[in-house]
Amino acid sequence: IDEIIEENTYLFSARLEVEFLNEKYNLQIPESDSYTTLGGYIVNHTKEIPINEEKIIIENFEIIIHSASNKKIELVRFSIKEEKR
């Protein structure tokens, strides 16, 4: 699943690759050898599997967990926050 909900807000499967999301949506999510998927990016930051409806801020991204089990993240709402000037 990868769909635009509104400007700068998306619904993404956590299994999508960071490289794919960056190419398709120009998101500029940092890439790393530590992870390849959006779920991996989130867990790399949180160090654990987040719970449903948990809100996570990573840099200028706001991520709300829509669906997760105790083993993996399934679906997230991904928003880009405008940088404050």
Task: For the regions a language model picked out, list residue spans one by one.
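Cytosolic regulatory modules rich in charged/polar residues
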Residues: I1-R85
